[in-house]
């Protein structure tokens, strides 16, 4: 396996790759050559692999000599685990050195043969020789050793023994009968509970069977389940009593939580048999007081049933060997030792640290013996830093980092190094003073690669400190998790004998212990020490991993500690991994991840209670399903009770339920599971069940983000220039509400906002320190500590002094100046956001403050308010009268810029006015408006996710004035709130998944606003409003909406409709109500109405109380009441209908009352006017909900009208009415949502006045009234309709919402059908202008237009005619046609065209474009483009025979581009412009910008400026001149002399120096400023780049100029004015793209050919398509086929719209894909060919056939299609036959032509069509149904023709011959005529005509051929021919006459000749 021969379990092999395991010191991976030291055994024992050891066992037990044999690790007499073996070779060949009798664990065995682990007579684990496999065989009954050497009983055993065996004395790994695995005997296997009897044999499961059920008289097979344990096959032979008795005998009398076997049987309850004489784990003598790792024996039982875990042996280790005071692993497991984990040992008897194999005498983890040598993994000069780098003069380290002593036979893993030399590789307890590093995972700390990771020396610790076992040195640290306590203790894994300092950093202070938490002893054991590990926090002993006595993974100290997996730790309830009672371990809920707890709460809200275990959450939709048992029972009950007769005299009870608004029922834990569990372990988040009260400490200076009291503004401007608004103060940081602001000064109680927020998340406010902080803050801010409110949790909320909220009497409070409590919910203060001018109103607003707050005054806050008010009053008013002093608010244009808009008359008309607030949003007014005199502080208010303009409705101007107009609102930071983390959700992907934008859209629809967009990056919500009130996202909008599942949504919709119907009021109650004067209403006490005292009517709810208040009372009560008109809808009281109120009032459930309630829906509309009714004279004053003007409804049915004006007294019910006033008022409020005026029919309402006595109730029992419905002759305009007043509630009624809307849809030929009015149509007819304006076509109904509605059909010319289009494009298309190649594609009739390669197209297009110069802007631009193409790619005389990439070619192209730039930039009047002395410098600069250097020098000479002319003459001369000029400019700059030089002159000097930018005394000078992109590129080419640079160099320099972060050049925008700026990618000029394409061949052709790069008409593709073909000819073919095809199709459509469809086909032939090309050409042909019976081909059709090669059959088929669409079926058949589409032609002929031809007798025409099917070979065969359709017609025509020929023949013989030839054909046709399909009546007529003709032919044949029996022939003809009834009757009569004649002419029967016998 490792390189040697592969003997099978014992054969002697040759040398292996391990090298030195046969007695000689050969080179092996673990020998000297591999690791630098002599060959040694692998695990440090000479008996292990090759050398002669001193008879030492694996764990240090002395072995006696015996016969030589070879085991797995070199033991000759033992098996792999201790049984004696013979001296045969081992399985690995090289392990054959004869050894002594000592086994791997030190016990002496007799000799035997070698098996898998070194013996043959004994099995693999020391048992008797098996008869089967090694795992589970039946052993012979000889007393041989078990798995670990102990003698086995003569019983059978399984492979691992102890997984359910029945023999109590089984020999196995963990549970033999001789001795247990850990030095104690046990009766059963590990994990077994004895013999499985009783109910433990098998797990209980219901028994599934079948049965027969009789249903409806038929037997049906059904599945059954028997819920009884005796029905199971395992228990079918026993009764319940027998099973119970067996369970009792086994000790099972209840739930066996502690007795169930674990994964490996840990925790199984076993019995205690007699202890045998021997029993260590591996064969050593068992001691009565040994534990696994050396702890003191106590009476507590181990989880293995004996004392294996938890008992401390006196002298023996776990494996039966005598303990010695050696180093680690040279002592028993658990024995106390004087050496720490990694300290050096006294001798080298341990197999992991002995001299042989890998080093002389070292322990496993680095103890060193006396000598020193290079370690196995620690030799010098290794390549990797962490694997043994050179240690210099220091000692070399081991595998785990320990420095070895002078040992020649060093262990491979450094086992045996001195513990004081270095820290180990994993930090196992080395001191912190070692200088030697290295080893497998760590090298020298100062120089190595992996110094601090594994094994480096550290004064603190290694990264994995607490798994490292530190020495007892006081200052040393190190360990797996960086624990560095200096108190010596046991190791982190406990029990390996070493001391440890606070393992795992999870506890501190518990002395002694182990990983698994056993009680501390002087030397802790692996599973039982005193040190708490992995999470223990207490000092008392708690549970170990397996239920020991100390705190472990999950222990929290004291007596509450649990086992590692949540198991109990009490000795009486000794727990195991899987079997103890859970307390507070790792798996307890308190230590489970929060997300798992949340999911458990959501999925199982009732927990694990057995009462609710079967109660599952189900949706309401499931209740109605047929599979629901409850629904089935309901159906059964319904059907069973349907025909029962009740004997009771009482009417059937009816339960009436009031209809109200349904509450939003939500689970308490909904939304908490949104948190991602995958990152749960890496986030520190609060508990989901803990109340976290976040402090919002704000000083007076800090203020509230929504108020301006905190700090006075510095300036009246909205935003000072250069100053950045306070982001922290005015914007949100993701938390809602926003975090506390830092105070301006060191005021008492000020805290940092971010710090307080974090503390609120991580600390409990119930902590004493936090409580003390809050109390101190409240004391410092003036709060009364002895207040009764401060004795509860209320004291946890830091509060401001209450005088902060009490305004000064001199300050006028508004919405912007009234401070709000930062600790209140902001939604509760919305009702107080009104502007009040009176002090009384101000007091009423603040009346809800507590008495304590009013008693405590804060002078500091009052002084701050007064100072702010005084400072604001002292500020200089703005000239425009605009008031804006609040911090954070701004305007665009700014207040300073608005001064320039001020007119002489005082107005300030500003376009695009914007008002905003930093961090909250802005409002944009797009139209011009007068902003003079606006007090923006009182008008505009931005809040969190909302905007309020004109909060006071009374001061709001009409729509269109002031700021109450159409505007665009942007609200920033509108993000939803994460319920789990209490933070805003900003992830765009998560916002998309939760459809946040859709929710905002629905809010916009709800508020009658138009949604524009949502930007998730900034949370900006943009929408447009028509007028202003309050807009935003309220608290109710933030709540989760109804489920989006289609089924649930349907149910939710039905519920919403039911609620809406319940909330709608009927007008009947108002029509029956009396009208009471307003004066009497003032005398009515609202409190009396509410209390119902001395009035005789039911008390009202809060709604009616508010309705009866006047304005002042309403706002005074608004602060103390829960009801407010400005509160969210969810805070308002439930609105119920009058019927629901009646239902609430009814006592009992009598059916009579239900009938009364039903009859209330049919109350008479009009009460008799002659019935006087009494009234009390009292009036009810209603609060105005809406300003409704008087409305008039008129129709043809009635002339009556009804006026509703809520400003006047509304109809009210009598006081004695049983309908409550609350319902009436709510009805009046919700009247606008009723469906009184649905559709176009509105019932007439008659205005009546009638009085009702106080004691008289409603007249409920009335007969329904039937009113005829008549169409109205007039239509009420929407502004005058009552529906207009309900526009805010239209969303609740689709009849209103869509009642006045109409969907526009375009029809054929760009026609549009839309509604209009009769008057508008008259105006259109009377219009006499040249072109009809679109506004008149779409004119709405005016306010005075009552004319009926009409429908109008309008046709539009969708594409505006392009003048000169034909003249500009046809020459270029002809050029393209002449230079293209037509290729015939195999398998296709359609050719493919592509341009010819070369530069000819460039030259020809350029020449053609020059002819069109000055024809228009597009033509001029086209000339510029083609000239640029000619300069970059065209053929020039000087470029003939030059290499493309030669320098001369590059310079020539540069000169050509320079020439093109000069011609393009040169203005028409630049050279002829007149200049003066003052302007010549500027003119010179213009000349230089066009590269007119000579003209500029001449101009300088003319003005005696010779020096400047000399400088300009050297432009572009080279680098030396530019350097000199640059130095000169720098000198002028340093001496400040440049301020005396003209700016234009300096710019020219900068051109000479080649510097585009310079800092001077004039400021920053940018030569490219305000220059278009062509000029900037030209300056780069001419002056800034080297004269020898290429076009690419100049282009790159320009790219750097405009693409840099601080760009100083204009980007290459298109030349047309309205260049798009809102595209995702910037749009650049076409010429710039061509330059890029010349410089970079793979530049995107898709971007280059986009029409918007050169024209504002995105549908103009002519130049783009021509460029595509030209570039393809030049070799640029990397454009995608899809883009090419799309561009060709678009350009062809443009040509088609211009009437050039033939050229459109030419364009379509350039499509590469064959199928797309053919389909596009055929479709265009079908749309544009002309159909004429006279003209075969028109000129365009001849062009496409002759010039373009379109097949004629395509043209014919296109004409056939167009003829068919036009109804010209004869032409259609003609063209189909020419196109050889015979099947289609046959169908057309049969459907439309043949019946008419037969009926009308046009046989020749029909024959000319049908004969073409016969003439063409095989055509009739390819036509389906030819035999029963076309063939019948053709045969009938042939027979008719032959009959006519017979009639012209005079020869009798010839006639008879012809008739004989006609007989078969006639007979066959008579048989097939009935098969002719007759889809229409015309076809049936045609069939009858043919049948009649055939009948006549039959008669003629009978006449001509008298020998034929006419009667027989006629009979046959009548049977076969489908004749009409009349004709058949006529023929039958004729046949009967002939038959009678025949009978009469025959002789009598007696005279007939009798037949002879021969004849018979």
UniProtKB/Swiss-Prot annotation:
<dbReference type="GO" id="GO:0000973">
    <property type="term" value="P:post-transcriptional tethering of RNA polymerase II gene DNA at nuclear periphery"/>
</dbReference>
<dbReference type="GO" id="GO:0071390">
    <property type="term" value="P:cellular response to ecdysone"/>
</dbReference>
<feature type="region of interest" description="Disordered">
    <location>
        <begin position="781"/>
        <end position="860"/>
    </location>
</feature>
<dbReference type="GO" id="GO:0060261">
    <property type="term" value="P:positive regulation of transcription initiation by RNA polymerase II"/>
</dbReference>
<feature type="repeat" description="14">
    <location>
        <begin position="135"/>
        <end position="136"/>
    </location>
</feature>
<keyword id="KW-0906">Nuclear pore complex</keyword>
<dbReference type="Pfam" id="PF21240">
    <property type="entry name" value="Nup98_GLEBS"/>
</dbReference>
<dbReference type="GO" id="GO:0006606">
    <property type="term" value="P:protein import into nucleus"/>
</dbReference>
<comment type="similarity">
    <text>Belongs to the nucleoporin GLFG family.</text>
</comment>
<dbReference type="GO" id="GO:0031490">
    <property type="term" value="F:chromatin DNA binding"/>
</dbReference>
<keyword id="KW-0509">mRNA transport</keyword>
<feature type="repeat" description="22">
    <location>
        <begin position="293"/>
        <end position="294"/>
    </location>
</feature>
<keyword id="KW-0805">Transcription regulation</keyword>
<dbReference type="GO" id="GO:0036098">
    <property type="term" value="P:male germ-line stem cell population maintenance"/>
</dbReference>
<dbReference type="Pfam" id="PF12110">
    <property type="entry name" value="Nup96"/>
</dbReference>
<feature type="repeat" description="20">
    <location>
        <begin position="266"/>
        <end position="267"/>
    </location>
</feature>
<feature type="repeat" description="29">
    <location>
        <begin position="365"/>
        <end position="366"/>
    </location>
</feature>
<keyword id="KW-0472">Membrane</keyword>
<dbReference type="Pfam" id="PF04096">
    <property type="entry name" value="Nucleoporin2"/>
</dbReference>
<feature type="repeat" description="39">
    <location>
        <begin position="467"/>
        <end position="468"/>
    </location>
</feature>
<dbReference type="GO" id="GO:0044613">
    <property type="term" value="C:nuclear pore central transport channel"/>
</dbReference>
<keyword id="KW-0539">Nucleus</keyword>
<dbReference type="GO" id="GO:0035167">
    <property type="term" value="P:larval lymph gland hemopoiesis"/>
</dbReference>
<dbReference type="GO" id="GO:0003723">
    <property type="term" value="F:RNA binding"/>
</dbReference>
<dbReference type="InterPro" id="IPR025574">
    <property type="entry name" value="Nucleoporin_FG_rpt"/>
</dbReference>
<dbReference type="GO" id="GO:0002230">
    <property type="term" value="P:positive regulation of defense response to virus by host"/>
</dbReference>
<feature type="repeat" description="7">
    <location>
        <begin position="59"/>
        <end position="60"/>
    </location>
</feature>
<feature type="repeat" description="8">
    <location>
        <begin position="73"/>
        <end position="74"/>
    </location>
</feature>
<dbReference type="GO" id="GO:0035080">
    <property type="term" value="P:heat shock-mediated polytene chromosome puffing"/>
</dbReference>
<dbReference type="GO" id="GO:0044614">
    <property type="term" value="C:nuclear pore cytoplasmic filaments"/>
</dbReference>
<feature type="repeat" description="9">
    <location>
        <begin position="81"/>
        <end position="82"/>
    </location>
</feature>
<dbReference type="GO" id="GO:0005737">
    <property type="term" value="C:cytoplasm"/>
</dbReference>
<keyword id="KW-0720">Serine protease</keyword>
<feature type="repeat" description="42">
    <location>
        <begin position="516"/>
        <end position="517"/>
    </location>
</feature>
<dbReference type="GO" id="GO:0140585">
    <property type="term" value="F:promoter-enhancer loop anchoring activity"/>
</dbReference>
<feature type="repeat" description="37">
    <location>
        <begin position="441"/>
        <end position="442"/>
    </location>
</feature>
<dbReference type="InterPro" id="IPR036903">
    <property type="entry name" value="Nup98_auto-Pept-S59_dom_sf"/>
</dbReference>
<dbReference type="GO" id="GO:0051028">
    <property type="term" value="P:mRNA transport"/>
</dbReference>
<feature type="repeat" description="11">
    <location>
        <begin position="105"/>
        <end position="106"/>
    </location>
</feature>
<dbReference type="Pfam" id="PF13634">
    <property type="entry name" value="Nucleoporin_FG"/>
</dbReference>
<keyword id="KW-0811">Translocation</keyword>
<dbReference type="GO" id="GO:0017171">
    <property type="term" value="F:serine hydrolase activity"/>
</dbReference>
């Amino acid at each position: 396996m490792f390189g040697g021969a592969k003997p099978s379990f014992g054969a002697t092999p040759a040398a292996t790759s391990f090298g030195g395991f046969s007695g000689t010191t050969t080179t092996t991976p673990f020998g000297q050559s591999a690791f630098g030291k002599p060959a040694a055994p692998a695990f440090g024992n000479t008996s292990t692999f090759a050398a002669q050891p001193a008879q030492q066992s694996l764990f240090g037990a002395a072995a006696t000599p015996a016969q030589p044999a070879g085991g797995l690790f070199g033991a000759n007499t033992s098996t792999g685990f201790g049984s004696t073996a013979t001296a045969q070779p081992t399985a690995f060949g090289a392990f054959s050195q004869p050894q002594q009798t000592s086994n791997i664990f030190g016990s002496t065995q007799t000799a035997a043969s070698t098996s898998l682990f070194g013996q043959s007579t004994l099995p693999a684990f020391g048992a008797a020789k098996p008869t089967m496999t090694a795992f589970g065989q039946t052993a012979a009954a000889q007393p041989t050793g078990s798995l670990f050497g102990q003698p086995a009983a003569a019983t059978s055993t399984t492979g691992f023994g102890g997984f359910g065996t029945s023999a109590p004395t089984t020999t196995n790994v963990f549970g033999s009968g001789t001795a247990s695995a850990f030095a104690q005997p046990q009766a059963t296997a590990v994990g077994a509970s004895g013999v499985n009897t009783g109910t433990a044999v098998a797990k209980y499961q219901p028994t599934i069977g079948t049965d027969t059920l009789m249903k409806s008289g038929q037997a049906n097979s059904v599945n059954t389940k028997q819920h009884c344990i005796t029905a199971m096959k395992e228990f079918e032979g026993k009764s319940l009593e027998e099973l119970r008795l067996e369970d009792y005998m086994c000790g099972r009398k209840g739930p066996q939580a502690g007795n169930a076997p674990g994964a490996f049987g840990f925790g199984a309850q076993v019995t205690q048999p007699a202890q045998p004489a021997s029993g260590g784990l591996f064969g050593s003598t068992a001691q009565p007081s040994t534990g696994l790792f050396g702890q003191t024996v106590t009476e507590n039982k181990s989880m293995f049933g004996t004392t294996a875990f938890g008992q401390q042996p006196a002298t023996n280790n776990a494996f039966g060997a005598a303990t010695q005071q050696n180093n680690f692993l040279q002592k028993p497991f658990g024995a106390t030792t004087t050496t720490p984990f990694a300290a050096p040992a006294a001798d080298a008897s341990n197999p992991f640290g002995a001299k042989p194999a890998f080093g002389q005498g070292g322990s496993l983890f680095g103890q060193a013996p006396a000598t020193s040598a290079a370690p196995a993994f620690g030799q010098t000069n290794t390549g990797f830093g962490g694997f043994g780098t050179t240690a210099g003069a220091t000692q070399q380290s081991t595998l785990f980092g320990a420095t070895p002593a002078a040992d020649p036979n060093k262990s491979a893993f450094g086992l045996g190094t001195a513990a004081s030399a270095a820290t180990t590789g994993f930090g196992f307890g080395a001191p912190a003073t070692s200088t030697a590093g290295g080893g497998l995972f760590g090298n020298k700390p100062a120089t190595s690669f992996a110094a601090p990771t594994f094994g480096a020396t550290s004064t603190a610790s290694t990264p994995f400190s607490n798994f490292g076992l530190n020495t007892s040195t006081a200052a040393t640290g190190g360990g797996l998790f960086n624990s560095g306590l200096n108190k010596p203790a046991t190791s982190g894994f406990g029990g390996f004998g070493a001391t440890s300092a606070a393992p795992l950093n999870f506890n501190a202070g518990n002395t002694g212990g182990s990983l698994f938490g056993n009680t501390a002893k002087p030397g802790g054991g692996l599973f039982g020490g005193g040190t708490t590990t992995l999470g223990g926090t207490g000092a008392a002993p708690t549970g170990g991993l397996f239920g020991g006595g100390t705190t472990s993974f999950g222990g929290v100290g004291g007596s509450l500690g649990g086992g590692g997996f949540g198991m109990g730790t009490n000795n009486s309830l000794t727990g195991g991994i899987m079997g103890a009672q859970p307390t507070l371990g790792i798996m307890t809920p308190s230590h489970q991840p929060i997300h798992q707890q949340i999911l458990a709460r959501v999925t199982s809200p009732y927990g694990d209670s057995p009462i609710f275990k079967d109660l599952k959450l189900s949706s309401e939709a499931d209740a109605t399903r047929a599979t629901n048992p409850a629904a089935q029972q309901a159906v059964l009950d319904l059907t069973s009770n349907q025909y029962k007769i009740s004997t009771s005299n009482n009417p059937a009870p009816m339960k009436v339920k009031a209809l109200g608004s349904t509450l939003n029922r939500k689970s308490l834990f909904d939304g908490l599971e949104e948190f991602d569990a995958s990152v749960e372990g890496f986030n520190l988040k609060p508990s989901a069940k803990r109340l976290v009260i976040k402090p919002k400490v704000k000083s007076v200076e800090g203020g509230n983000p929504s108020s301006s009291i905190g700090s006075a503004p510095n300036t009246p401007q909205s935003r000072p220039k250069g100053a950045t608004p306070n982001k922290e103060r005015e914007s949100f940081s993701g938390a809602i509400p926003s975090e506390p602001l830092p105070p301006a000064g060191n005021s008492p109680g000020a805290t940092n906002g971010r710090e307080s927020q974090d503390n609120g998340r991580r600390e409990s406010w119930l902590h004493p320190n936090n409580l003390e902080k809050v109390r101190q803050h409240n004391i410092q801010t003036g709060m009364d500590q002895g207040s009764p409110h401060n004795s509860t949790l209320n004291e946890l909320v830091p509060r401001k002094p209450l005088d902060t909220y009490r305004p000064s009497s001199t300050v006028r409070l508004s919405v912007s100046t009234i401070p709000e409590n930062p600790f209140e919910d902001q939604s509760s203060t919305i009702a107080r956001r009104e502007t009040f001018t009176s002090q009384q109103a101000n007091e009423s607003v603040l009346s809800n403050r507590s008495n304590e707050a009013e008693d405590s005054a804060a002078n500091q806050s009052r002084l701050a308010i007064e100072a702010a008010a005084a400072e604001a009053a002292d500020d200089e008013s703005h000239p425009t009268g605009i008031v804006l002093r609040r911090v954070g608010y701004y305007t665009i244009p700014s207040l300073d810029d608005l001064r320039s808009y001020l007119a002489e008359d005082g107005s300030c008309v500003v376009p695009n006015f914007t008002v905003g607030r930093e961090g909250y949003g802005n409002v944009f007014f797009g139209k011009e408006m007068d902003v003079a005199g606006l007090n923006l502080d009182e008008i505009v208010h931005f809040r969190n996710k909302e905007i309020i303009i004109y909060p006071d409705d009374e001061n709001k101007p009409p729509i269109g004035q002031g700021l109450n107009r159409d505007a665009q609102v942007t609200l920033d930071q509108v993000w939803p709130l994460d319920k789990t983390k209490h933070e805003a959700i900003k992830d765009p992907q998560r916002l998309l998944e939760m459809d946040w934008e859709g929710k905002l859209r629905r809010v916009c629809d709800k508020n009658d606003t138009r949604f524009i967009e949502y930007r998730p990056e900034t949370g900006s919500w943009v929408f447009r409003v028509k007028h202003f009130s309050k807009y935003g996202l309220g608290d109710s909008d933030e709540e989760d909406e109804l489920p989006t599942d289609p089924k649930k949504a349907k149910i939710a919709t039905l519920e919403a409709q039911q609620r809406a119907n319940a909330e709608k009021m009927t007008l009947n109650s108002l029509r029956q109500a009396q009208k009471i004067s307003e004066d009497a209403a003032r005398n009515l006490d609202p409190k009396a109405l509410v209390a119902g005292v001395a009035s005789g009517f039911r008390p009202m709810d809060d709604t009616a109380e508010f309705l009866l208040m006047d304005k002042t009372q309403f706002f005074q009560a608004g602060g103390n009441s829960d009801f407010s008109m400005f509160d969210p809808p969810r805070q308002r009281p439930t609105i119920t209908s009058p019927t629901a109120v009646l239902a609430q009032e009814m006592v009992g459930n009598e059916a009579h009352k239900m009938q009364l309630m039903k009859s209330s829906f049919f109350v008479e509309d009009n009460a008799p006017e002659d019935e006087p009714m009494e009234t009390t004279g009292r009036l009810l004053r209603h609060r105005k909900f809406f300003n409704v003007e008087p409305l008039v409804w008129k129709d043809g049915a009635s002339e009556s009208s009804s006026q509703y004006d809520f400003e006047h007294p509304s109809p009210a019910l009598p006081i004695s009415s049983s309908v409550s006033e609350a319902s009436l008022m709510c009805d009046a409020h919700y009247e606008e949502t009723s469906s009184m005026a649905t559709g176009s029919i509105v019932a007439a309402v008659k205005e009546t006045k009638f009085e009702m006595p106080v004691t008289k109730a409603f007249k409920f029992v009335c007969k329904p009234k039937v009113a005829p419905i008549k169409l109205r002759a007039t239509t009420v305009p929407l502004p005058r309709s009552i529906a207009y007043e309900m526009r805010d509630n239209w969303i609740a009624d689709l009849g209103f919402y869509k009642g006045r809307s109409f969907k526009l849809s375009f029809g054929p030929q760009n026609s549009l059908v839309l509604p209009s009015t009769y008057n508008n149509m008259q105006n259109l007819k009377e219009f006499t202008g040249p072109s009809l304006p679109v506004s008149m076509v779409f004119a709405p109904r005016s306010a005075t237009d009552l004319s009926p509605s009409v429908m109008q059909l309008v046709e539009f010319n969708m594409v505006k005619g392009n003048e000169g289009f034909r003249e500009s494009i046809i020459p270029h298309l002809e050029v393209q046609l002449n230079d293209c190649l037509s290729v015939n594609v195999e398998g296709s009739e359609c050719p493919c065209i592509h341009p010819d390669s070369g530069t000819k197209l460039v030259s020809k297009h350029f020449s053609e474009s020059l002819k069109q110069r000055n024809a228009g802007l597009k033509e001029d631009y086209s000339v510029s483009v083609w000239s640029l193409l000619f300069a970059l790619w065209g053929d020039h005389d000087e470029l003939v025979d030059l290499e493309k990439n030669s320098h001369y070619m590059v310079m020539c192209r540069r000169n050509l581009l320079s020439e093109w730039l000069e011609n393009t930039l040169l203005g028409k009047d630049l050279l002829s412009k007149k200049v003066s002395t003052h302007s010549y410098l500027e003119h010179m600069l213009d000349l230089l910008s066009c590269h007119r250097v000579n003209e500029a020098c001449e101009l300088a000479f003319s003005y005696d400026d010779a020096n400047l002319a000399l400088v300009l003459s050297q432009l572009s001369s080279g680098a030396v001149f530019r350097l000199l000029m640059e130095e000169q400019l720098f000198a002028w700059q340093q001496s400040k002399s440049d301020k005396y030089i003209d700016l234009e002159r300096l710019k020219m000097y900068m051109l000479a120096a080649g510097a585009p930018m310079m800092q001077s005394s004039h400021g920053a000078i940018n030569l490219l400023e305000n220059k278009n992109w062509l000029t900037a590129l030209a300056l780069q080419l001419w002056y800034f780049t080297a004269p020898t640079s290429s076009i690419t160099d100049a282009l790159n320099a320009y790219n750097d100029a405009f693409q840099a972060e601080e760009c100083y050049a204009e980007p290459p925008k298109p030349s047309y004015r309205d260049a798009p700026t809102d595209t995702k990618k910037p749009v650049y000029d076409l010429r710039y793209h061509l330059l890029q394409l010349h410089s970079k061949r793979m530049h995107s052709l898709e971007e280059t050919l986009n029409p918007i790069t050169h024209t504002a008409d995105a549908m103009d593709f002519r130049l783009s398509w021509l460029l595509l073909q030209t570039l393809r000819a030049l070799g640029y073919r990397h454009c995608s086929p899809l883009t090419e095809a799309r561009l060709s199709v678009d350009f062809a459509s443009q040509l088609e719209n211009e009437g050039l469809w033939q050229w459109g086909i030419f364009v379509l032939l350039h499509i590469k894909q064959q199928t797309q090309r053919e389909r596009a050409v055929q479709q265009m042909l079908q749309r544009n060919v002309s159909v004429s019976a006279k003209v075969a081909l028109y000129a365009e059709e001849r062009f496409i056939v002759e010039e373009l090669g379109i097949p004629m059959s395509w043209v014919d088929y296109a004409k056939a299609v167009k003829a068919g669409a036009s109804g010209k079926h004869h032409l259609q058949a003609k063209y189909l036959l020419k196109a050889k589409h015979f099947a289609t032609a046959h169908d057309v002929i049969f459907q439309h032509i043949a019946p008419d031809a037969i009926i009308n007798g046009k046989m020749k025409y029909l024959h000319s069509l049908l004969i073409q099917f016969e003439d063409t070979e095989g055509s009739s065969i390819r036509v389906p149904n030819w035999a029963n359709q076309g063939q019948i017609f053709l045969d009938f025509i042939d027979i008719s023709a032959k009959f006519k020929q017979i009639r012209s023949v005079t020869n009798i013989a010839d006639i008879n011959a012809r008739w004989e030839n006609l007989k078969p054909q006639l007979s066959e046709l008579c048989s097939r005529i009935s098969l002719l399909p007759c889809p229409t009546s015309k076809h049936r007529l045609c069939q009858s005509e043919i049948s009649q003709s055939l009948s006549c032919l039959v008669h003629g044949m009978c006449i001509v051929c008298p020998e034929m029996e006419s009667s027989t022939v006629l009979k046959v003809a009548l049977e076969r021919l489908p004749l009409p009834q009349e004709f058949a009757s006529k023929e039958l009569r004729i046949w009967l006459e002939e038959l009678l004649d025949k009978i009469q002419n025959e002789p009598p029967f007696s005279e007939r000749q009798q037949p002879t016998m021969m004849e018979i």
